[in-house]
A protein has these predicted regions:
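Glycine-rich phosphate/diphosphate-binding loops that line cofactor/substrate pockets in enzymes
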Residues: 104-113
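Hinge/beta->alpha junction and helix N-cap segments in small-molecule ligand-binding domains
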Residues: 2-10, 28-37, 90-100, 116-158, ...
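Flexible loop/turn connectors
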Residues: 165-267
Length: 267
């Protein structure tokens, strides 16, 4: 089950490119929820219709993994909660990347930080939130979290709520590019100057970030290359049957036009 963000389009492109080079095809099947996804896996497994599956957006309690283990379909997990999974996986250290983001903003003088997260039931959301709150506490900053769903509307709603507080944040980290662009629009509507009064940082770098005005600072990951890495993980699993963990490069912070030193009142 995939999201609609540019992240997934880039990931799919990388997977497909690498598989095609080995004469294999990528099958995409759109489903509305995990229950429908599980039914699809059962049909694929019972009919031996696929050689392997790639699973994304791992939940804290994820019934899909138990079913895939039961069916015995070779499985690759993308972005799981840790590298210590009983499945082949491509792992991202979301906690360390979040600590890097918070440290950067606090280094700019920000003491009131907020995070607009993805859905809280996702494992990577929890990892980022825990790291965000932990690093804020360690550095003596105040951290607040508002849950979103990766969509434009939730980014708009969350940003309005945060900026409407009596002591609004001077910096906001968004869990994806779509919500960050929506937040930038809200700041313009509310006459909150970016970055002079409010710094914004997107988690997934994309053309949306680069083309916004001002261009959004972002945590940048080469998602296409990660897709190639996922495909290589699939091919190695099929060739050897060995379950291995692969670590993706850490996202790097790209400072553009939406982050700067904190307003004097926040310092």
């Amino acid at each position: 089950m995939l999201g609609f963000e540019p992240f997934f389009m880039e990931l799919i492109g990388g997977i497909e490119e690498s598989l095609a080079a080995e004469g294999r095809s990528l099958l995409l099947h759109v489903v509305p929820d995990h229950d429908a996804e599980i039914r699809t896996y059962r049909r694929w497994g019972e009919g031996k219709l696929v050689d392997a599956v790639v699973v994304v957006n791992i939940a804290l309690e994820d019934a899909r993994l138990e079913v895939l283990g039961e069916l015995g379909i070779p499985t690759v997990i993308v972005g799981g909660p840790s590298p210590n999974l009983p499945f082949a996986n491509v792992w991202i250290d979301n906690a360390q990347a979040m600590r890097t983001a918070v440290t950067h903003l606090v280094g700019l003088g920000h003491r009131r930080l907020a995070r607009v997260s993805g859905p809280r039931h996702l494992a990577h959301t929890q990892a980022r939130t825990d790291a965000f709150m932990g690093e804020c506490a360690r550095l003596g900053a105040h951290g607040a979290v508002v849950e979103g769903d990766y969509g434009e509307e939730s980014g708009t709603r969350a940003t309005r709520a945060l900026l409407g507080r009596g002591s609004p944040p001077s910096a906001i980290i968004y869990d994806n590019d779509v919500m960050a662009v929506a937040g930038l629009g809200v700041a313009h509507e509310m006459d909150v100057a970016v970055p002079e009064r409010l710094s914004l940082l997107a988690w997934d770098d994309s053309a949306l970030c680069r083309l916004s005005h001002p261009a959004l600072s972002a945590m940048s990951l080469d998602v296409h290359a990660m897709g190639v890495q996922v495909a290589d993980c699939v091919l190695n699993l099929l060739a050897s049957g060995t379950v291995r963990s692969y670590t993706a490069p850490l996202p790097r912070l790209v400072a553009r036009g939406t982050t700067t030193t904190a307003p004097t009142a926040d310092g």
